[in-house]
Amino acid sequence: MSSDTSDSRPPNPDTKTASTSESENPAIPSPKPKSGAPLRNQDWWPNQIDVSRLHPHPPQGNPLGEDFDYAEEFAKLDVNALKADLTALMTQSQDWWPADYGHYGGLFIRMSWHSAGTYRIHDGRGGGGQGAQRFAPINSWPDNVSLDKARRLLWPIKQKYGNKISWADLLVFTGNVALESMGFKTFGFGFGREDIWEPEEILFGEEDEWLGTDKRYGGGEQRQLAEPYGATTMGLIYVNPEGPEGQPDPLAAAHDIRETFGRMAMNDEETAALIVGGHTFGKTHGAGDASLVGPEPEAAPIEQQGLGWKSSYGTGKGPDTITSGLEVVWTNTPTKWDNSFLEILYGYEWELTKSPAGAWQFTAKDGAGAGTIPDPFGGPGRNPTMLVTDISMRVDPIYGKITRRWLDHPEELSEAFAKAWYKLLHRDMGPISRYLGPWVAEPQLWQDPVPAVDHPLVDDQDIAALKSTVLDSGLSTGQLIKTAWASAASYRNTDKRGGANGARVRLEPQKNWDVNEPAELATVLPVLERIQQDFNASASGGKKVSLADLIVLAGSAAIEKAAKDGGYNVTVPFAPGRTDASQENTDVESFAVLEPRADGFRNYVRPGEKVQLEKMLLERAYFLGVTAPQLTALVGGLRALDVNHGGTKHGVFTDRPGALTNDFFVNLLDMGTEWKTSETTENVYEGVDRKTGQLKWTATANDLVFGSHSVLRAVAEVYAQSDNGERFVNDFVKAWVKVMNNDRFDLK
């Protein structure tokens, strides 16, 4: 392997590279962790939760400052001028990185796809919403070879438009423009993605080598990808295009395709549309010996200025480019939208061959079609070629049925690809209210739509009256608080899904989630619905209250009463404006992935879960976007309020349950209590009097972590102090309101 570096500095010694792989990049160097590296606290004590995960993207790292308002800056952008500049860029081939066929469209489509395509449904992480492709590890994934060049091609445009367009939006929008520049009619586009300024630690796999697969598949007969992963292979976006583990089996590859694209919320038709549509353009690159490619951007020498994979094969660019190690041109019109991909896929029989770099691919059998595929730089015509995963679109019975239909009805492919591409680019952005710009398409089911407000909202007098009504309804404060939490706590800050807006807690599937205690919901919701109906029937001026608003308002009223019972007078801020979604506009299957495996705030864990409870509590806190102090305040407050799942008393360290007090912290930190593992109940601890041995409390790890974890204990000590009872109550209220308003993007 040659790193092809200048003599001024050696390659980065912190990353070693491997030159053997059975993956998409058969010999392109991949990073390996440095042995003997200094250990972090997490390395010494891997079972301790890392609460720093709750504080990603600190404002100190943002060069634009905390007051920067991207939506406000974007409003100044001439989007048509930006689009025109991007369209012009497509055919402005640069000598330092020449365009295939004189058009950068294929490269930019891949850039946008690989930016958005990291999204995964099980935890909502990934996607193009933050411009993460600029940072490690994604900028150095083996699957992203040469995308560093694509981003550098965009720099003059980013420099020109400045803060008015984020990198996150630009990376995704450019692919959309690329499609349109080659004759495709897209479905629309929404701006609104805000940049991050440093990478976030995301678990993309437990393998200690890129291109590994050994830690994400179980040993069962059926190959099944572990949750929450969205890719078959460490460092790839979806699947190995040579087939599973580099074995060129199109049918086996179809299984992997279906699973990984499903992890991105795509069904079979959407998956086929993306592959067929995306592979209508451009080519792959495997011109020669991949061992001649240098290290990835994060390991490249400093003088390469963030560009990686410098190749010493020929010129290292243009006709000598090595990106994936595969050398495939799918169609005879690689810069034009048409149906040629399917015409060629079904127009030939195919035989297994290898690229010049040694990667498995297919070529039209017996020399058929020789010379019909144009060379990207004017060389002799080529034979038709396809990836192993392209052949999957023909031989898999389900994909084959879909693609054969499109072969005869190309207009159906155009519509399917347009909608699937739009979904791909926007899946992690949350509700349509977050979209900016003039080209936003009509709401789609996968965006979890809620109706617009079409009536006057309740005022302060109405709010006070409704609070009084719910407190006199016969429902307990605990029932009201639990229902409000159940409604709001489905929110995921990763992909901005879930939350109280829409009142989907009353709909399938949420109303039957075990964590939400369906039987109790069935008691509480009808009472609140009657209050809503009575108010709406009698309110003056056409004012109405949605059930979504009333659920949150009822929880607020209950907290105010609980605080008063604890000796504190507080007002829980409330902002009306939520509306009620319909079952018709709620995709049950799509929402199923939001069901919590555990919710430590309610001391709930799904039967059979073996992951440490405190780790799942931290994950839930991360989804809710709360800080370590907010996490601490919320758990302590909810325990004092006695709102555990199923009414258990674990962590209810108080002799006045239901009152909002700091008793949880006072009693947790009481050295008169000794904690022991329960001998009879899994995941339960017993707190006994040190002198008498008498049982005082029971708890789970969700409770005791606030005494055992040094960072969380430091916060708990603040709230346990004799002078901080009121501070705790106020902090709890602020954290509660944050959770209730997480999905109120209209307030932000």
Curated annotation (Swiss-Prot):
Taxonomic path: Bacteria, Bacillati, Actinomycetota, Actinomycetes, Mycobacteriales
Annotated PANTHER family: CATALASE-PEROXIDASE, HYDROPEROXIDASE I, BIFUNCTIONAL CATALASE-PEROXIDASE
One Pfam family cited in the UniProt record for this chain: peroxidase
Record-listed E.C. numbers: 1.11.1.21
GO (cellular component) term, any one: cytosol
Chain positions of site Transition state stabilizer: R110
Positions of crosslink type Tryptophyl-tyrosyl-methioninium (Tyr-Met) (with W-113): Y238-M264
Disruption-associated phenotype: Defects cause isoniazid (INH) resistance.
Subunit description: Homotetramer.
Similarity field: Belongs to the peroxidase family. Peroxidase/catalase subfamily.
Reactions that this protein is recorded to catalyse: H2O2 + AH2 = A + 2 H2O; 2 H2O2 = O2 + 2 H2O
Cofactor: heme b
Post-translational modification: Formation of the three residue Trp-Tyr-Met cross-link is important for the catalase, but not the peroxidase activity of the enzyme.
Function: Bifunctional enzyme with both catalase and broad-spectrum peroxidase activity. May play a role in the intracellular survival of mycobacteria.
Cross-link (Tryptophyl-tyrosyl-methioninium (Trp-Tyr) (with M-264)): W113-Y238
Name of the molecule in the record: Catalase-peroxidase 2
GO molecular function, one term: heme binding
Superkingdom per UniProt: Bacteria
Entry keywords, A to Z: Heme, Hydrogen peroxide, Iron, Metal-binding, Oxidoreductase, Peroxidase
